[in-house]
């Protein structure tokens, strides 16, 4: 009888993942693509329901992922080297969870095999976001949805 092999995210640290493994950790929730506001007094990060102009509001996927940094220069590309700084990511984010020594949730596509689970479980904001072109930046505070960290 063959020994059970643990999934890669349980066997490897973030800095040991290959590019395909790293990308597969993304659950497709799109929350990292929401506009965020930082409290200047305590550094808290607040998520708004206002999405980056490249984010598809229904699928929660970037419409130009490969070239996103050309269109949105301040788009943050997550890397394993930044793992210690992932507190600003949503508490459900696989990158943050693994960086904090936690496991993936049961609804994560790598665990359940269903990429739609993140939407069915309402982890994503699919259908509940606004495009940044629809809201003046001065009004973003009116659209806060949660605090990270």
From Swiss-Prot:
It holds the Pfam family CxxCxxCC. NCBIfam families: PRK05170.1-5, PRK05170.1-6, PRK05170.2-5. HAMAP family: UPF0260. This is UPF0260 protein Avin_32930. InterPro entries: Puta_zinc/iron-chelating_dom, UCP006173. Belongs to the UPF0260 family.
